[in-house]
Amino acid sequence: MRRADSGLRSLVISRSLLEHVVRTRVAAQGDIRILEACSVVGLASTDNCERVTGVRLRQTHTSAGTIDIDDSLAGDLVGDSLAADLVLDASGRASRSPQWLKELGYRRPQRDEMHIGVAYASRSYRREPDHLEGDNGIVIAATPGNPRAGVLLAQEGGRWIVTLAGYFGDGPPSDSDGYAAFAATLPSQDIHAVIRTAEPLDDPRPTRYPSSIRHRYEHLRRMPERFVVFGDAICTFNPIYGQGMTVAAAEALVLRDCLRRGTQQIGRRFARRAAKVIDIPWDIVVGGDLRFPGVEGRRSLKVRVINGYLERVHLAAASDPAVGRAFLAVANLTSRPERLLVPDVAARVIRGTWQRTTGARTAALTRR
């Protein structure tokens, strides 16, 4: 992608710092308590199971020993259940809400799954001023011809975070030489040029992501009152696209609006509105992954037409910054996909396809 101002601002910090700041601010609120050394093992409900009344807890252990749940809850614990006016499941991909609903006599939501077999590993390196000619990062996308990807981003403390990934279980090795060799197979050598000389600060941390999953809670005709499923507990996206946190933030705004209308049927109301938030990024992720021949799934006419047009968008963006800005806005969910079809952008895409361009699909994060 041609180097130009994208119009976007990115916060490039480590996950640990972000979680520390968020957790600290939440804990500073006088009416919020964070319970540790315990886990939720089920839902508590009325006798007829029509309303969720809390969660069932189980004590766990930490290196500091077992924390007395009864003391920390100060009377809110009834037996093994914590009473609540509203229960929100934000437990992520491992959510057990489908099973918990079944235990209360409700149907499980329909589950859509796209098997992709993404394997990736992240590693930190010492950052030097001359790396990437001073840019703050680079993203190298996977393509059907080379289903490997990489991202290198600046973080606090003078560090780079590098993530290398591949489809169909083809992830990077966990040894230093193998990790660097994997980076050398990417269609651009920018990441490899940095890590082959940079000082590593830790070992590669491998992770596997077998599939993108969407639970269709919006299709359920019945849900218990006072119960909401949220974020990755509804839908988990291929992490290569980096859309999970953006979708969760958008869902938080939807939840705020739903709560302003009260808690009656809050679960179903939120699920229906959240589905509209999820639809676009889900289509982007599923459609993008169906470009790879090894991914199983129905390639409808709509998917084939959209993917064909996006290939032309990528080609045009290599030489036209206006097309690049439009694509990045859609990919980062700050604009709707229709932005790529407005006459000015479409005309630029058509002109761009006349210019025979080869090379990696990359995007650089520059200093501001």
What do the PLM-derived regions correspond to, one by one?
Residues 20-27, 39, 89, 101, ...:
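Primarily hydrophobic membrane-targeting regions of prokaryotic envelope proteins
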